[in-house]
Structures are given as structure tokens and as C-alpha cells.
From Swiss-Prot:
Residues 719-736 have a biased composition (Basic residues). It comes from Mus musculus (Mouse). Residues 110-123 have a biased composition (Acidic residues). Residues 124-135, 165-185 have a biased composition (Basic and acidic residues). It is found in: Nucleus; Cytoplasm. Pfam families: MSS51_C, zf-MYND. PROSITE patterns: ZF_MYND_2. GO terms for biological process: negative regulation of DNA-templated transcription; spermatid development. Its main location: nucleus. The gene is Zmynd15. Zn(2+) 2 binds at residues 322, 325, 349, 353. This is Zinc finger MYND domain-containing protein 15. The lineage of its organism: Eukaryota, Metazoa, Chordata, Craniata, Vertebrata. Zn(2+) 1 binds at residues 307, 310, 331, 335.
Length: 736
């Protein structure tokens, strides 16, 4: 697929942006010995003429003593477009952080210090997952930071690691086994090189949280752990960083200089007192001794655009959309022509341009939502992190929608682990949907809905939600399932009579993300209270420790209880009603590709934001669905994704997909794309699979998996005469 905006982890784009800016900064800064009287003198005169930013700028000095970066086999240093690791993964960029696990892992440098003497007897001083620092050719150990420009080449992995460090600190004990790969590779002598140590990070932000520049002080030796990274030699680097941040700010906005600057280190503050005024910038009288941002401070979303062909960021080149479709961004005529003439023709922009132009016409339709915040969240410059933080949505399931990490002292919520659900539930299925303020979900209405809902407006009105509530972002998953059951299946498969079924078995395929939000599906029983539901989450991205788990959520008075699944399947199959005529919700987990799943045939299959062309297992799972021939509905985050899914379905099975239609229960949050301007929304469009007719379909026009020759075939003439005689004989008897 050419465009992966709706499928790629935002954090990877964020890391690629940081590294792209950092790589440009290192290239323009030159070697560390470059005198300030050189190129930076020329830059000073340019900066003095820049317009002034009224916001306060902050230079943060952030040491790191505990986390190291271990590069796996094949992780060779070298710059490349975006994340350097993408070069190791072929032409397709990585879509998830776990895609980098063979190349990058985290190691605890503190553990290495504490256990060094004990491990020395057994492993000659080597910790599990890391090797002893090797000396250079002359017998000298690698210098700590003098070789920083050379050491900067592996920075893409370092960048990801630095940003993940806080999450690693808070959830180390909760990581699955495959996340602790370095410990498993104990005894492999040539597994990986010495861990990189990012000793210090210099970060320039404004008072609103926009990141403007970054510098990494890295050394490859573990021996420096525990030592305070000295700031006596940081002044030239910090000054160069400030100059580059003003001339080429990483965040949004044109080049500018701050009205005032404050520094987070006392010694560095003194060193910069004579340098910063040369830029026409006022330095605060005293350093920022503690972290003291404004109450609403949060790092703003960074979504710098990139050229679709060369992947250069907007701070490197000027980007303009294609003049015909306005959908794809290019840095100039050369990249536009290269994309226009690509071979084969069906991947060229010449082929896709009119189609992308039609997709762009959906911008207004997809942004037509009833919420009070619609204009903000559907904007191309939507700052999602600031939106969530301003509403106190920084814990529970909300953390999975953004890159915000809970700070020290904040409650930790495990992700995607059914074993933790019992302690998290506490009788309230909406606990993980709450923010820091008042309850977001009102009590369940006493009466079930009397009509079917086909829009967020109707659902919010019945549920007692204000149109200012952002709950639609999480409830898009259960409401999409509800819409498929109540509207789309009756329209496309009326013979199933699904609305009259008392129990439904639904398979949710490739459901790694949806399983991490499993409690939102309780809303299905609120909307369909008289239907017994079984949701089976299937996919190899599910936690391996959750495989074959089975539990039931059941209403007990005003609360909801969670029970293991032993003996529950009988209740589901029998259709026994719970108290008040309500039924329970069963959850099953199968951590495997769908084509390897064994079990009863489902009533319905659903997949969210599937991206058939991005994962090879779909080439096996789609034929499996073809053989089952059950209604299978899928959502996509863009109309482009629907077209690619149709092509993949044709290749895998010879079938196709229905025409996609906008999902009225799509997420209101627009997904910002890096190399294009197309509208991307989670669950934006819905389609269903159109299966290839069975092999016997050409012989008989009547559909059906197994033909019955005796019934429709022309019977022998004598038999027809006998039936006629019988009918004639019966006629007079009836009249008498």
C-alpha cells in the first residue's frame, strides 16, 4: 500500500520526525570542534532579524542513567528516510513498535551495575541481552561523547527508545515474554553489540509544549552509568541547538526567536548568559530549578508533513500538493514526475490521481458530525494530545489514543490483559472509560431503545450524553458492531433474519487493538439487551498469554460481575435469560491467525481498520472466510484503503468487496497523515466481502453450497402423470 497513515503507530511518525530534524541539525552543525566564529556567526545575524515569539521558550537538560539501547543483529548504523530501521525492514515502513523488536530492545543499565560482580563469574562480566564493551583497535575503550556525530547514525532506534523510556519504567513488570528478548538470548555470544547509552538529552520547547529542537548526548560505553553527565562542556552544543531551533523550528510555525528563554540547569544557564543575548533574546535572570510548566502544559502533537517520494520533512523543503488531485504532497516537480511515471502503471500517480481526487471530495462529508468540538477534531492541524489533556483524559483507555504517558504517581492500568480485568472492573464496566473529572458515562437508561439508531445524534440523545462528550472516540467500536447487526446485515443478507436471533456469535478478526479496549463492548448489551452475545477476538497480535481465555460479563443488579468462562458456554447455547430479561456478554480469545482458528461457525465476522494489503496472513484468512461464507464486514480509515482491500480480496479468493459506505458511527478524531491530505478517520467506511460463487454455480442458477439434483430436476413423465391423477382425484372429494 502506498499510504499507511491510518495503520501506522503515531509514535513511529513522531520518532521519525525527531530523528529527521536531529539528523539535519547534526549535518548543519558540523563537527563538535566547529568554532562559534564560523557558520554560527552567519546564522546569528539571520536570527536577530527573525520575528519574536511572545511565548516563553525552555531549554531542558534531561539526564538518563538507567535505560540503554541494545541493537540486534543486522541493525547497521546509517541514515535513511525517516526511521533508519525502516531500511532493515524492506521497502515497507514499520507499522508498529513491535516491528522493530528484532533490531532494538531496552536494557537496564542499573541492573548491569548491580549484578556485574555476580555475573562476572558466570558470564565473564556480560549481562543477559548485552555484551561487554569492547575496546577499539588501539586497546582504548570507546570515548564517551567525543564521537557524537558518528554515534548519531543509530539515532532512529535511540529516538524510539528515549521516548519509550518512561513507559518502560512504569510497565517493566507487565511486559510479555517476547518484550524481554535480551534476557532470552542469554549465552548467545555474538547476538548484539554493546548497549548504547543516551547519557543526556537537550530539549527545546515553548511554554505550550511544542517541541522545537532536540540534541542527544550519546556514548556506547556502559562504564559511564551512574556518573552525572557533566554540563560544563554543553554550552556550545546548547547554543547551536538554540540557533537551529529558531532558524528551523521542529514544531509548527515559521522561523522565529523567543521573547525570553529559561534554562533547566544552573551551570548551563551561567554559560549561556554571554551567548544568548547575541541573538536578541532575553535570558531569564535565574535558571528553572524545577519542572514548573503551566497547569495545562502537555507536549503538543507533532505532525510535520513529508514528501511522498523522498520523505523529506516540511522543515527541510517546501511541500505542495498535487495540483490536480490535491491529495499527495511533493517537495518539487522532480518527485511529482517520478511518482507520475512509476512502473507498473497501476502504482503510478497518473493512474491514481483521478481516484484520489474523488476521495478528496469526501472531506466535508466525513467531517459532518454533530459534536460541539467537531471543527477542532476534524481539522488537519488537530492537536490530539492537547485536546485529551485539556479534558483530563489521560488515564485508562484514553492513554491508548495518544502518546501521552502518565506521570509519576499516576495510577497504572495494564493493557490488553484479561487477567487484570477482574481487579479493574470493580462492578463498573465504564471505569476505564473515565477521565480525571466527573463520570463521562451516565447511568444506563431503564428502558431499552424503542427504535434503531443510525447516527451519533440519536444515540447520544437516548443515552443522555452531551454533544460535548468525546465518548464517541471509544464507543465507535461497539456502535459500529451495533450498526452492522441492526442495519447492514438486514440490508445485505435479509435471509439470515439476524434481528430475530436470540443469540449471536461474532468473530472480531485481527483484534489486537480492540481487545485492549474490551470493556467498551459492554455497551452492546445496553443497546441489544435481549440478545446473548459471544465475542471471540482472533489474531496473532493478541497477547499470547491470553490465548484460549474465556470469561463472562454479567449484570448483577446495578453492577456488572466478571466470571471465568467454565460452564458458561452452556448458558449461552441454551439462551437462558438473566435477571430482568437481560443476557450476558461472553468474551473468548484466540491469539492466532484467523485461518488457524478451529471451532463453530460464527453468525457474523467483523474487522476494524483491517488493511488487507499490509499483512500476509490475510492471504490465508480471506480464503478461510470464503469457505465459511458467513457475512463478513470490515471498516477502513479511508476510501483508499477500501479500494486496496478489494484488490487483495480479488487476489486471495477471486471475490471482491461491496461498495464502501461512510460509517455513521466513525470516530470523530481525524488521523493526520504525513505524506497526503486525504481524510482519515478510524472506522470511516464499511464494506462486506462478496464471495466468489461456488464451483457448481455455473451449472445451476440457484445459489447454494450443495446442489440438490433430485428436487429441481425434471422428474420422469409417469411420475408427473401420477401426481396429476392424484390431484384430480382429490378435487371432487374436496368439493363434496
Amino acid at each position: 500500500m502506498e499510504f499507511v497513515s491510518g495503520y501506522r503507530d503515531e509514535f513511529l511518525d513522531f520518532a521519525a520526525l525527531l530523528f529527521g530534524w536531529f539528523r539535519k541539525f547534526v549535518a548543519e552543525r558540523g563537527t563538535m570542534g566547529t568554532s562559534l566564529e564560523g557558520r554560527w556567526r552567519q546564522l546569528e545575524s539571520q536570527i536577530r532579524r527573525l520575528p519574536q515569539d511572545p511565548a516563553l521558550w525552555v531549554l531542558h537538560v534531561l539526564p538518563n542513567r538507567s535505560v540503554g539501547i541494545s541493537l540486534g543483529q543486522g541493525a547497521e548504523p546509517g541514515p535513511g528516510p525517516g526511521l533508519g530501521a525502516s531500511r532493515l525492514l524492506g521497502d515497507e515502513p514499520p507499522l508498529h513498535l513491535r516491528d522493530l523488536s528484532p533490531y532494538v530492545s531496552f536494557v537496564s543499565l542499573e541492573d548491569g551495575e548491580e549484578g556485574e560482580e555476580e555475573e562476572e563469574d558466570e558470564e565473564h562480566g556480560e549481562r543477559p541481552g548485552m555484551e561487554k564493551v569492547e575496546p577499539q583497535e588501539g586497546g582504548e575503550p570507546a570515548p564517551p561523547s567525543k564521537r557524537f556525530p558518528q554515534e548519531a547514525k543509530p539515532a532512529p532506534e535511540s529516538e524510539v527508545t528515549q521516548q519509550e523510556a518512561s513507559r518502560e519504567e512504569g510497565s517493566r513488570e507487565e511486559r510479555p515474554e517476547d518484550e524481554r528478548a535480551p534476557e532470552k538470548r542469554k549465552g548467545q555470544k555474538n547476538a548484539e553489540a554493546a548497549p548504547l547509552h543516551l547519557s543526556c538529552l537537550l530539549l527545546v520547547t515553548d511554554e505550550h509544549g511544542t517541541i522545537l529542537g532536540i540534541d542527544l548526548l550519546m556514548d556506547g560505553a556502559q562504564g559511564s552509568v551512574g556518573q552525572n553527565p557533566g554540563t560544563e562542556n554543553l554550552a556550545p552544543r546548547a547554543y547551536a541547538l538554540l540557533c537551529h531551533s529558531m532558524a528551523c523550528p521542529m514544531g509548527s510555525g515559521d522561523p522565529r526567536k523567543p521573547r525570553q528563554l529559561t534554562v533547566g540547569d544552573a551551570h548551563l544557564h551561567r554559560e549561556l548568559e554571554s551567548l544568548v543575548p547575541r541573538l536578541g533574546v532575553k535570558l531569564a535572570k535565574t535558571p528553572m530549578r524545577t519542572w514548573g510548566p503551566r497547569p495545562g502544559f502537555t507536549f503538543a502533537s507533532l505532525r510535520a508533513r513529508t514528501c511522498h517520494v523522498c520523505h523529506k520533512h516540511s522543515f527541510e523543503v517546501k511541500l505542495t500538493p498535487c495540483p490536480q488531485c490535491s491529495a499527495v504532497l511533493y517537495c518539487g516537480e522532480a518527485c511529482l514526475q517520478a511518482d507520475w511515471r512509476r512502473c507498473p502503471d497501476d502504482v503510478s500517480h497518473r493512474f491514481w490521481c483521478p481516484r484520489l481526487s474523488a476521495f478528496m471530495e469526501r472531506v466535508g462529508e466525513l467531517a459532518s458530525l454533530p459534536f460541539t468540538y467537531t471543527a477542532e477534531v476534524t481539522s488537519e492541524t488537530f492537536n490530539k494530545e492537547a485536546f485529551l489533556a485539556s479534558r483530563g483524559l489521560t488515564r485508562g483507555y484514553w492513554t491508548q489514543l495518544s502518546m501521552l504517558i502518565p506521570g509519576p504517581g499516576a495510577p497504572r492500568y495494564p493493557w490488553g490483559s484479561t487477567s487484570s480485568l477482574s481487579c479493574l472492573l470493580n462492578g463498573d464496566p465504564y471505569q476505564l472509560l473515565q477521565g480525571d473529572g466527573p463520570a463521562l458515562m451516565p447511568p444506563v437508561p431503564l428502558e431499552p431503545p424503542r427504535s434503531l439508531f443510525g447516527s451519533w445524534q440519536d444515540y447520544y440523545t437516548w443515552r443522555g450524553l452531551s454533544l460535548d462528550s468525546p465518548m464517541a472516540v471509544l464507543l465507535t467500536y461497539p456502535l459500529t458492531v451495533y450498526y452492522v447487526i441492526t442495519h447492514l446485515v438486514p440490508q445485505s443478507f435479509p435471509e439470515l433474519n439476524i434481528q430475530n436471533k436470540q443469540s449471536l456469535k461474532i468473530h472480531v478478526v485481527e483484534a489486537g487493538k480492540e481487545f485492549d479496549l474490551v470493556m467498551v463492548f459492554w455497551e452492546l448489551l445496553v443497546l441489544l439487551p435481549h440478545v446473548a452475545l459471544e465475542l471471540q477476538f482472533v489474531g496473532d497480535s493478541l497477547p499470547p498469554e491470553s490465548d484460549q481465555q474465556h470469561f463472562t460479563m454479567q449484570r448483577d443488579g446495578p453492577e456488572v460481575s466478571l466470571r471465568p468462562g467454565s460452564g458458561v458456554s452452556a448458558r449461552f447455547n441454551s439462551g437462558t435469560k438473566e435477571k430482568g430479561g437481560r443476557r450476558d456478554l461472553q468474551i473468548r480469545v484466540s491469539a492466532r491467525p484467523y485461518h488457524l482458528l478451529q471451532g463453530p461457525k460464527p453468525d457474523l465476522v467483523i474487522g476494524f481498520n483491517s488493511g488487507f494489503g499490509l499483512k500476509d496472513t490475510w492471504l490465508s484468512s480471506l480464503p478461510r472466510l470464503q469457505s465459511l461464507r458467513v457475512p463478513a464486514f470490515f471498516t477502513e480509515s479511508s476510501e483508499y484503503g477500501c479500494v486496496m482491500d478489494d484488490q487483495t480480496m480479488a487476489v486471495a479468493t477471486g471475490g471482491g468487496t461491496s461498495s464502501p459506505q461512510p460509517n455513521p458511527f466513525r470516530s470523530p478524531f481525524r488521523l493526520r497523515a504525513a505524506d497526503n491530505c486525504m481524510p482519515w478517520y478510524c472506522n470511516a467506511f464499511i464494506f462486506h466481502l462478496v464471495y466468489k460463487p461456488p464451483q457448481g454455480g455455473t451449472v445451476r442458477s440457484a445459489p447454494g453450497p450443495a446442489p440438490r439434483p433430485p428436487t429441481p430436476a425434471a422428474p420422469p413423465v409417469p411420475a408427473r402423470r401420477r401426481r396429476g391423477e392424484k390431484k384430480a382425484a382429490r378435487g371432487p372429494r374436496r368439493r363434496r
